[in-house]
């Protein structure tokens, strides 16, 4: 399990490597100690100590008749009244103060950089705006498990545009119903991008809830149709994920199994400067998809389905090509961008090797940040 000192050491190690760390924030519900409505003391150091009472629980919780509950019903918009634990009443001032103290403590005392809010269909998402306003995280994403892009857009607005959300619309409509089934028209304006909200989209193919954890489970229900052992399918999906605007989240089991291929895709995305608001030109029919994605330093061309057999586009370098997918990139003539945003005048042949970007100019070799290697 570890302790707070070991956690602090771990976070410091991540930060020393230039990484930022998110806390998994579960504030929709809380487990009890023994009876229906007895809770642990919440000690958040300088941000306060809280002694949760049964009156902090929503009045339509399963604990009805077991103890005295709060004044308000659950205000969740999608998955209200979580059955396995007590539901906090986020309209209750004490609960609000506790959650604000908790998020500030996580960020400023424990030194997490941001938050992944769990089970956000269980309480009104406007509360996320309140808690983020208090804590000011570097990054925030909410788990609102709905596959409708219009509803996700509405929830982002209700949260004051003060958080991103996992793009379940892309997961279900583009990956499950589109690429998995080679119905490539569903790649057009996929997910929140189709609503002009790609900057608020954390895009993903699978997560710990949707992933088939065993061969028997995979065969039995396909867990939304994905199979990590279908290499062509997984690489088609990841090529789309890592080419498109949004904040892509690579599923760790995919990374472990296909590290070499995914490294090349990530390097190409970085080289071209694809970002959460990159523009996309795209065309598709049922059997194929073609797109050009514009970055700050170049472009990516993505071909799926029968389009993968196209000839290499002029002026582009091949990143990776396989069964029903091909990915190419180019960069601007003036080289690449450094970490601090300065431009370098490194010209020459750009290529990807072992997942890393390099630039060769005569006898000189530079890395992807324009630093001379030899």
Please state what every model-predicted region is.
Residues 1-82, 88, 123-142, 147:
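Acidic/aromatic-lined carbohydrate-recognition and catalytic surfaces
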Residues 3-4, 95-96, 230-231:
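A conditional alpha-helix N-cap/helix-loop micro-motif detector
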Residues 11, 15, 19, 23, ...:
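Active-site-proximal helices and loops of the catalytic beta/alpha 8
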Residues 33-97, 159-174, 202-204, 212, ...:
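Glycan-binding loop/region signatures in secreted carbohydrate-active enzymes
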Residues 61-68, 296, 331, 362:
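Extended, charge-rich alpha-helical regions
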Residues 81, 234, 284, 342-344:
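Short solvent-exposed loop/turn micro-motifs enriched in small/polar/acidic residues
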Residues 86, 239, 289, 348-349:
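Residue-level detector of beta-strand structural context in well-folded domains
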Residues 334-374:
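C-terminal outer-membrane/trafficking sorting elements
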């Amino acid at each position: 399990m570890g302790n707070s000192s070991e956690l602090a050491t771990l976070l410091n190690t991540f930060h020393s490597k230039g990484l930022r760390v998110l806390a998994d924030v579960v504030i929709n519900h809380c487990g009890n100690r023994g009876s229906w409505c007895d809770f642990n003391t919440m000690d958040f150091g300088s941000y306060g100590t809280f002694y949760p009472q049964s009156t902090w629980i929503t009045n339509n919780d399963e604990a009805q008749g077991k103890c005295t509950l709060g004044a308000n019903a659950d205000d969740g918009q999608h998955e209200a009244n979580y059955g396995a634990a007590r539901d906090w009443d986020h309209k209750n001032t004490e609960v609000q103060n506790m959650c604000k103290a908790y998020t500030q403590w996580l960020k400023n005392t424990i030194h997490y950089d941001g938050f992944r809010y769990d089970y956000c269909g269980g309480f009104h998402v406007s509360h996320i705006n309140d808690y983020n306003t208090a804590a000011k995280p570097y990054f925030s994403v909410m788990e609102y498990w709905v596959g409708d892009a219009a509803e996700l857009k509405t929830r982002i607005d209700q949260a004051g545009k003060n958080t991103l959300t996992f793009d379940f619309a892309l997961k279900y409509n583009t990956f499950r119903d589109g690429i998995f089934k080679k119905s490539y028209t569903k790649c057009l304006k996929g997910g929140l991008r189709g609503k002009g909200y790609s900057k608020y989209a954390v895009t993903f193919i699978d997560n710990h809830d949707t992933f088939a954890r065993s061969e028997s489970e995979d065969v039995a229900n396909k867990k939304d149709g994905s199979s990590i052992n279908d290499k062509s399918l997984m690489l088609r999906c990841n090529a789309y994920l890592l080419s498109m605007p949004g904040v892509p989240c690579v599923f760790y089991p995919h990374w472990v199994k296909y590290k070499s291929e995914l490294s090349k895709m990530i390097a190409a995305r970085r080289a071209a400067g694809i970002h959460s608001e990159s523009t996309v030109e795209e065309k598709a029919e049922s059997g194929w998809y073609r797109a050009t994605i514009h970055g700050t330093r170049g472009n990516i061309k993505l071909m799926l389905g029968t389009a993968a057999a196209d000839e290499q586009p002029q002026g582009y370098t091949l990143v990776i090509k396989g069964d029903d997918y091909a990915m190419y990139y180019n960069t601007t003539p003036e080289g690449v961008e450094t970490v601090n945003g300065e431009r370098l005048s490194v010209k020459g042949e750009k290529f990807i090797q072992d997942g890393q970007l390099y630039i060769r100019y005569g006898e000189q070799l530079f890395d992807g940040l324009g630093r001379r290697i030899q």
